[in-house]
């Protein structure tokens, strides 16, 4: 890299950067704020939140590089757990906040007698804090979208208290009442036991929550041909099931983000070993994603196409240089 940039960037300069200022979500916002203001829309914006684990099985353990439960794998894995908050307007998506889960409390597990870690700030607390910060930053959004791992009672109540709409997944064992009278009498049943057709929506009351929600059931087909059932809830009682599900599908853009920061922004290639440098590397990967997104807007090429185009062009130049060497020898 130093040779490529004629010495303007050195290994020592990168090392000093990674071990310098503690870079955070606040710095991300300062960087991306001008782009958000350029593309923001007063209606139709969706705030998307989700977490992802970058596995690092061979890196020394610390408060961010530790064991986390992976709901994708159904087991605990060693790595970094990052919660991200994205804003989406049409086809444009930018991260506006992120938090790295810090398991900064050591405790002894009574059953196993082993020392374990837990976080002083939970993922659900980070979830609510990032929504609050987005509102403070005056980011226009109409809906909050998340999967069922963030469908906790406190999260739904918090979003509703902000007078914002949510469309969030709930687990199949969540219990609901089908009328206000049933709610008052304590007559609740699991959503999985409800006689609902694919795409159907009903008005329901989640246990422990005062306000009613629209409950939607969707049946989907997996890549292996098996089928699954998705339940989502919304405090938007005026929109139909098809409209709400169409909006909810915008949530999948965060999966593209997770894939891109891992494969195109070198999130997984951090050689750092201490918390500060590891955290600053994560920040740098997210900034790189933002720059790729800006290029995508300007070129109409997605991140993977941009990367492929650069690799092809670099190889063409290398092949031409190789040919020059051969002709020189001849």
Segments predicted by a language model, with ranges:
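Short, basic interhelical loop/turn and adjoining N-cap
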Residues: 3-17
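A broad structural signal for alpha-helix termini and local helix breaks/kinks
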Residues: 5-6, 40, 265
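Flexible, active-site-adjacent loop/turn segments at secondary-structure boundaries
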Residues: 15-16, 67, 148, 265
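Active-site-proximal, Lys/Arg-enriched surface segment
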Residues: 17-97, 200
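Single, function-defining residue in the core of a domain
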Residues: 43, 60, 92-94, 98-330
């Amino acid at each position: 890299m130093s040779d490529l940039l004629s010495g303007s960037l050195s290994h020592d300069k990168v090392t000093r950067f990674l071990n310098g200022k503690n870079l955070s979500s606040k710095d991300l916002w300062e960087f991306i704020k001008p782009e958000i203001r350029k593309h923001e829309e007063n209606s139709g914006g969706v705030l998307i939140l989700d977490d992802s684990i970058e596995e690092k099985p061979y890196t020394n353990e610390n408060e961010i590089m530790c064991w986390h439960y992976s709901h994708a794998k159904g087991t605990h894995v060693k790595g970094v757990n990052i919660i991200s908050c994205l804003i989406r307007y049409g086809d444009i998506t930018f991260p506006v906040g992120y938090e790295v889960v810090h398991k900064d409390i050591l405790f002894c597990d009574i059953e196993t007698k082993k020392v374990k870690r837990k976080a002083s700030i939970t993922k659900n607390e980070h979830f609510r804090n990032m929504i609050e910060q987005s509102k403070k930053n005056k980011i226009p959004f109409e809906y909050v979208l998340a999967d069922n791992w963030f469908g906790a009672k406190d999260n739904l109540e918090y979003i509703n208290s902000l007078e914002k709409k949510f469309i969030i997944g709930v687990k199949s064992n969540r219990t609901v009442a089908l009328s206000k009278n049933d709610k008052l009498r304590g007559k609740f049943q699991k959503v999985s036991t409800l006689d609902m057709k694919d795409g159907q929506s009903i008005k329901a009351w989640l246990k422990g929550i005062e306000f009613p929600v629209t409950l939607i059931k969707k049946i989907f087909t997996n890549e292996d041909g098996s089928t699954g059932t998705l339940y989502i809830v919304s405090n938007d009682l005026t929109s139909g099931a098809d409209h709400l599900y169409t909006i909810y599908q915008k949530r999948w853009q965060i999966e593209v983000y997770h894939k891109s920061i891992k494969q195109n922004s070198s999130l997984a290639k951090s050689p750092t070993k201490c918390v500060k440098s590891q955290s600053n590397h994560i920040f740098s990967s997210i900034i790189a994603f933002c720059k790729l997104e800006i290029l995508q807007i300007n070129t109409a090429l997605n991140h993977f196409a941009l990367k492929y185009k650069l690799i092809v062009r670099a190889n063409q130049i290398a092949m031409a240089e190789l040919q020059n060497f051969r002709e020189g020898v001849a």
